[in-house]
């Protein structure tokens, strides 16, 4: 986002001029042909990949019915926004970077800055809308099913564009300094201190704080739900083990594994005198009703395992079943840990990419206007920070769509032209 571009000013101090462009002939002002060729290739590749990636996401949602849901509508709107950044903003930004001076006039400059701020701010706020939708879905899944409507998604999308509009328009209405238009070779946004605070906090710092809070709560809720599921499984396993046995463990078969017949004999030996026939429920001598569970052999025959009666009669679960329950519980625990690690990894990628792309830019954008006379920003570093922010429009479709198996299947269909048939 070229909200606050960085570069060398007309004197030895640093100002917020785009991509290192300034009125003097230091640094990158006298660009070489090789610099222009290399920069054109790099930026052209970035723009092409951003356009292609976001266009594929939009096409996948439009053509694949299984992707047409509220969550993916937000991802599709994000792709449209990033596509607008790639088509409307990045070509002019690349031209400015390659030529190292603004050549399109003041009116085009104002339009360029307004589109830049509007689209990039909306892109960032779309990430907040997606985080908010996911937070509601995981913390209130039952009620939110009915609330998660296309109308709600449209309201969130409209809000992102409204906030972007409120941040991008003020400089065009006069919230700027006289120096902002003093050099026709430069295209800079307002360096007014009030607008700097207003725009940086509205476009980044407040959304960043909101995303950190939301994804933190999403992680806690997901971890709680995963561990709750594991506890239920463990309780179920414990619920089938109604007693412990002092009898020796069942004998092993020739292959070293507990035999099914041994399980049956172990159960029968312990259930002395318990009336039971053919898996049916029958009255005991003490007139208490017994619940019967069947333990099957590998073969066709089957034995019967009585459970405790209300009068306190004691029975036992074969050791082989207890070990099976333990193995099942252990497998569930491992699956839960894997899901928890995957959740941490996914949220880490989402937040890590967003912070890596935009935090350096907005730190400089907030600090430089207040220390213009004493701060120095190398021109090359300023250009890298600028384009690092722009690259977020390339990475968003990768993070939010290409890691999704449903999107992957849709992309394969697009590549194979199955939608054309």
Swiss-Prot record:
Keywords: Behavior, Cell membrane, Cell projection, Disulfide bond, G-protein coupled receptor, Glycoprotein, Membrane, Receptor, Transducer, Transmembrane, Transmembrane helix. One of its GO terms (biological process) is regulation of serotonin secretion. Most abundantly expressed in midbrain, in dorsal raphe and hippocampus. Detected at lower levels in amygdala and brain cortex. The chain crosses the membrane at residues 39-59, 74-98, 108-132, 153-174, 194-216, 347-370, 379-403. It is found in: Cell membrane; Cell projection, Dendrite. A motif (DRY motif) lies at residues 133-135. Disruption phenotype: Mutant mice display decreased exploratory behavior and increased fear-related behavior in anxiogenic environments. Mutant mice display altered monoamine metabolism in specific parts of the brain, especially in dorsal and medial raphe nuclei, thalamus and hypothalamus, leading to altered levels of 5-hydroxytryptamine, dopamine and their metabolites, as well as altered noradrenaline levels. Glycans are attached at residues 10-11, 24, 30. Heterodimer; heterodimerizes with GPER1. Interacts with YIF1B. Interacts with GPR39 and GALR1. This is 5-hydroxytryptamine receptor 1A. The gene is Htr1a.
